[in-house]
């Protein structure tokens, strides 16, 4: 009997998720986070979510056929102060395919804080470099609407939506 129970546990789907809803001025995006393969990134993201950190921030980088990025800037492109950076979980086996969420970072390996992106194409060249920690489970039409927004360069920033795309809130389901 113990063998059967152990076998059932080992062969079951071990993918554990935390589900969230992100409401933007373009619509709602449903998200699932992988807290098994990306526990540090997931805990970090949830810390910001629970603090309502993302409320009022914009998608500041929108590159059609690549990514939409958010999580750190206000509408005037000033940066919101963050917690300390986390370790990079880029080698967790998750791939930067369409609809997945990854941690944005600087050129420093362990520099991710609050910013994240949603892949709008299969960007497997990012695998092993940028940590994937979740996926879109509903609202890809909203992701596509954001991806297709008109953009311009503003100061030091490129690919900024002409009309701000704002996160109203991100909440756990």
Identify the residue ranges that each predicted region occupies.
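Low-complexity, intrinsically disordered regions enriched in charged/polar residues
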Residues: 1-4, 80
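Sec-dependent N-terminal signal peptides
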Residues: 3-12
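Cyclophilin-like peptidyl-prolyl cis-trans isomerases
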Residues: 14-173
